Each structure stands twice: as structure tokens, then as C-alpha cells.
Amino acid sequence: MTGCASRVESCPAANQTQPGAAYETLAEATYPEMAKYPDETAYMKKDGSFDDEGFSKVYDAWWADKRARRDIDIDRENVQSFVRASTGAMLGEECGKNFVYSPLNVYMALSMLAECTDGDSRAQILSLLRENRLEDVRAQAKALWNANYCADGAVTSVLASSVWLDDGVDYVRKTLDTLAQDYYASSFSGEMGSDSYNKALQSWLNEQTGGLLKDQASGLAFTPETVMALATTIYY
């Protein structure tokens, strides 16, 4: 899980990754289009007056989009319960270290993991997420993603997620489609531990964080024994 902050106003797109022959994109997330915040300077007329009508039309569209995301229904009590329970567990083991923990990233990753598991494993994850049904986890994760998403040209806030599978593992297409549609997560397949697959992971991380964490990303790699890996980032 990776996060970074920047004044960069462009949003790293999920479909920027260009897969090479060494690995395959199984499913690709598409981020929603968002109304752009109007540039006031673009509405200044040659005579020095301001095009209030034109500006207001664009601004109203932006505000309607912004308000709709603000009003997304989220089970806040559920999220707060997860944050309280997980923060102590995550940070308690890192006492004395310069450690950053994003409950939102972990919530998204665990929600995705619940989609990829079954039986007792899924039940344990659902319990940790304070939910009884996978459908509720799915709805909550999608709501959280959209409530925190912004790419209006003035503010950038993007949660990116991905699933990395070993090319010798069978997968369920429906699950990957669900991850792409409801979690905005892309899925890839390749040879675990290979240089090309490791570089693909690093490239994806750099794209999703605007290249601000290249040093950290360069040290991340899969082991040959890895069957599946989840990667999440937050860019704001």
C-alpha cells in the first residue's frame, strides 16, 4: 500500500499501464468522468468583463457532481469501528518507527480479498470488516471509493487497486470483473519473481502515484512462491 501527496492536478489513469508480452492485463479499471472545476480566467472577456452566465453553468455542473459524491450513503459507524480496531493493531507493532497507516487502503484491500476467498477465510475477513454479507462489503467499498474520489482538474484524490496473479493460477472471470467494476481494481497475470513482472508492478505503482515514490517502488518485487498479490495506492 502506497500513498503520496502532491500539488499535481492531473489524475493518474487506471488504463495507462501498457502491458508487454511478458504479462497480461486480465481486467482493467475505468475511473468515472467528473465535471471539471471551471477556470475563472477562461471566462474573462476581451473587454475586461466576466462571463458570469457561462461560468455559472460550468460551476453548477461541477457542484452537482461534488454534492452527489458528498451525499453518498456510507455506513460511517461501521468504518469508524474498523478504524478503531485496526489502527491499534497496525501501529502497535511499529512503535518507535516512522510508520504510516491508511485505514481506507487496508479496508479496500481486505474487501477485495474477501471477493477472492471463500469459507472460513472469507468469514474471518467479513468479521474484521464488521459485515455479515459479501454484498454489503462490496457496496460499502464502492461507496467509500466514490466518496473519496476527485479528479476535477483542481483537486486530485484517487484510490487505485490492483490484483497480481501468477500465470499458472486459474481465475474466475466474474470475480475479476467484479473487482474492476465495484472496486475499480485492475488485474494482471504474469510469472511471479520475473524481472518483467516486477517491473510491471513498479511501473503501475509509479503511474498511480505520479512518479513521486520511485525510490520506494523500485525496491518492491514478487517472490517466485507468490500466488496472488494485492497492491493499493492513494494519490492526493
Predicted regions and their residues:
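Active-site-surrounding "flap" and adjacent substrate/cofactor-binding loops of secreted or lumenal enzymes
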Residues: 115-147
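Non-catalytic, conformational "gating/processing" segments within enzyme and secreted inhibitor domains
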Residues: 39, 96, 103-106, 134-236
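C-terminal motif of bacterial Sec signal peptides marking the signal peptidase cleavage site
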Residues: 2-3
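Generic structural signal for hydrophobic core residues of well-folded globular domains
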Residues: 90, 112-117, 129, 148, ...
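Flexible propeptides and autoinhibitory/regulatory segments associated with cysteine proteases
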Residues: 8-125
